[in-house]
């Protein structure tokens, strides 16, 4: 059977190599000409950690982790424009999906990255903050912060009446 289709197989290999070369040249030219951001070509600098910094970050006790998550949740809540700007919060395996009342109240993407987010996507009045696999714990902390803020508002309203 090989003898019957050898020419066809060689032709397909040649076509595949030609298209590989064509794709490489076209996409490399487009990426370099228009300075398209691809993974690894962001404007922000990547911070490299030393071995001592890595070991210090892994040496934390488990009691410090909830405090760290609470601080991260509070920072993200402030970066989103506060409790009053949030319409709804949802999450998937790695992302926080948040519907906002006013997108202009949110802070820059770099603020989210400094708070531990891997990236941010904005679309209309919705924002997706890429957190990672610990997004469910962060969501619980956000929910508790929002609930405590709302209960504090309710107490203030009842005291005013």
UniProtKB/Swiss-Prot annotation:
Name of the top EC class for this enzyme: transferase
Active site: 92
Alphabetical GO biological process terms: phosphoenolpyruvate-dependent sugar phosphotransferase system
EC number in record: 2.7.1.-
Subcellular location(s) per record: Cell membrane
Membrane-spanning parts: 10-32
Record InterPro entries: Glu_permease_IIB, PTrfase_EIIB_Cys, PTS_Glucose_EIICBA, PTS_IIB_1
Membrane topology of this protein: Single-pass membrane protein
GO cellular component, one term: plasma membrane
UniProt cross-references to SUPFAM superfamilies, sorted A to Z: Glucose permease domain IIB (SSF55604)
Superkingdom per UniProt: Bacteria
Keywords: Cell membrane, Kinase, Membrane, Phosphotransferase system, Sugar transport, Transferase, Transmembrane, Transmembrane helix, Transport
Keyword Transport: yes
Gene3D superfamilies: Glucose permease domain IIB
Annotated PTS EIIB type-1 domain residues: 70-152
PROSITE patterns from the UniProt entry: PTS_EIIB_TYPE_1 (PS51098), PTS_EIIB_TYPE_1_CYS (PS01035)
Keyword Kinase recorded: yes
Molecular function in Gene Ontology: kinase activity; protein-N(PI)-phosphohistidine-sugar phosphotransferase activity; protein-phosphocysteine-sugar phosphotransferase activity
Entry coiled-coil feature ranges: none
Pfam families: PTS_EIIB
Main location class: membrane
Role played: The phosphoenolpyruvate-dependent sugar phosphotransferase system (sugar PTS), a major carbohydrate active -transport system, catalyzes the phosphorylation of incoming sugar substrates concomitantly with their translocation across the cell membrane.
PANTHER family xrefs: CYTOCHROME C-TYPE SYNTHESIS PROTEIN AND PTS TRANSMEMBRANE COMPONENT, PHOSPHOTRANSFERASE IIC COMPONENT GLVC
Domain notes: The EIIB domain is phosphorylated by phospho-EIIA on a cysteinyl or histidyl residue, depending on the transported sugar. Then, it transfers the phosphoryl group to the sugar substrate concomitantly with the sugar uptake processed by the EIIC domain.
Name of the protein described by the UniProt record: Phosphotransferase enzyme IIB component GlvB
